[in-house]
Amino acid sequence: MEKTKDPADRSSRSERKRRDSFGMFDGYDSCSEDTSSSSSSDESEEEVAPLPSSLPIIKNNGQVYTYPDGKSGMATCEMCGMVGVRDAFYSKTKRFCSVSCSRSYSSNSKKASILARLQGKPPTKKAKVLQKKPLVAKLAAYAQYKATLKNQSVNKAPVTVEGFSWGNYITSNNVIAAPVTCFRHAPMGNCWGDIAEGVRIEVPNTDSNLPTKVFWISGIVKLAGYNALLRYEGFENDSSLDFWCNICGPDIHPVGWCATSGKPLVPPQSIQHKYTNWKAFLVKRLTGAKTLPPDFSQKVSENMQYPFKPSMRVEVVDKTHLCRTRVAVVESVIGGRLRLVYEESEDKTDDFWCHMYSPLIHPIGWSRSIGHRFKRTDILKKQESNYDAPSHLFIKVKDVEQGSEWFKEGMKLEAIDPLNLSAICVATIRKVLAEGYLMIGIDGSEAADGSDWFCYHASSPSIFPVGFCEINKIELTPPRGYTKLPFKWFDYLRETGSIAAPVKLFNKDVPNHGFRVGMKLEAVDLMEPRLVCVATVTRIIHRLLRIHFDGWEDEYDQWVDCESPDLYPVGWCQLTGYQLQPPAPQSNKDGQSNVSKQKKKSKSQPYKGHKKNFRKPGNRP
């Protein structure tokens, strides 16, 4: 029996460079450069320079927003009744204030209660995904919605995935799943080895009438992430007893384990009379075949150990003000995902979910070191049992040299909107921080106090040079209220007196990630990051992936980097004990589609880009 090779002996994956197709847009100049700056402080909120007073300013429930056209108008959510700025509402129809309300409305109308399941408490205690009241993350209506919540009594149904099976889903739809090797941050991602179709393993024999637990040898017929379709040896081309299981499960063993462990190998009773000499049959079938490495179970166990522990303190983005960080404490760790509770939360309900390799978390003192805004925590509320997470636990960013040709305030670029991850928008560098970090604002929809500026590192795969969308045939979302359509960068730079950020400063590295269009996976809904959902890769642009959540409309899609720690192989939730959100029933999707079709925007309206979903990252957990 041949063992699979240790992947450590393999050569590292080849790296290839993204073609530099943006040179034609590099060096756009204007008569003058708009470079506004703002002061900074170490551990307190700093004042941010307001946007030019020439733009109309709209106040909505305590938050101040500017709109170039001054024609925003108001709208009322058909689900929760909240009133707010129309342009801040979700979807093209502007019928709902948030993703949650849109989904809830559709679900309730079809008696499916999808949102109730999405926001409820999971049945498995191991998952510990806590139930809490939803927070509408629209910056324009956040305060009013919080007031509304106090007057409402919402009963949520427990989260359930009854009836959903990855195996049945893969088989019935005849689709493939992304291999485990695509997810280097996931358990076994770096040591999956030669596990492939044809590998033989020893598994429990469920086709037996014996009173004790017995085993038999099976072969992998098909792989889907951590899951494998298995067929007992002796069934040949008969698939009647094929079954799916998680390869990393405790009952999966390499061939030979039963012999060394003293466990009985018994053929399935359906075929036990097929051969008179099963030993000779197995010798013939297994000669030259591969099996799992003998230490496979040990490696799985080691890969399920995580360095972050409860009570560790970190700095994490403030989900109510994206421009600053706050101190949070690790409450629980599930599969490398952290449930962080903001240190000032007395009842531990003000939380935030992210992976331990997320660029949104940092060691204590990070904000001060780079000049990032920080919300100081009341020292009296600190618990003695909490301690600062060691700095070596955090993901390291790429070293950059901030020379004379570095990014400058006022430069234009294209960026994934952190409040609407389905859109890549026209953006501006609002502030240059230390160590390569930048504060980015989305043109046309920034809060006047800069509270929705977002911190990206210069090497981030979520920012792009001017012209990236045009060259790669991606719809670029123009500034809200911009009427000169179709949008042309050359004209916009001239009109705003701005220059494009130099192309050479952007990250052009493209790893050989292995993803293909149509592959299935489990993905975090970053608009409500406690949820991990059934998803599909629908488009690939270099290292950028378009992730679609099965059962939901395309407007819920999200742009994600191929190395994002928020993507996982099929079977990850089962392996770690996390709750998987199944696809929405087709009836609900159809209902939403019909509503959207009936209320399409009039062609006379000038703005045709994606509407920003004013949802703060992290408000689902």
Swiss-Prot record:
Zn(2+) binds at residues 77, 80, 97, 101. InterPro entries: Mbt (IPR004092), PcG_chromatin_remod_factors (IPR050548), Znf_FCS (IPR012313), Znf_FCS_sf (IPR038603). Signal peptide: none annotated. Monomer. Component of the NuA4 histone acetyltransferase complex. The keyword S-adenosyl-L-methionine does not apply. Residues 1-21 have a biased composition (Basic and acidic residues). The lineage of its organism: Eukaryota, Metazoa, Chordata, Craniata, Vertebrata. One of its GO terms (biological process) is double-strand break repair via homologous recombination. The keyword Transcription applies. MBT repeats lie at residues 164-268, 276-373, 374-479, 487-583. Residues 597-621 have a biased composition (Basic residues). This is MBT domain-containing protein 1. SUPFAM superfamilies: Tudor/PWWP/MBT. It comes from the Eukaryota. One of its GO terms (molecular function) is zinc ion binding. PROSITE patterns: MBT (PS51079), ZF_FCS (PS51024). Residues 1-55, 581-621 are annotated as: Disordered. Keywords: Chromatin regulator, Chromosome, Metal-binding, Nucleus, Repeat, Transcription, Transcription regulation, Zinc, Zinc-finger. SMART domains: MBT.
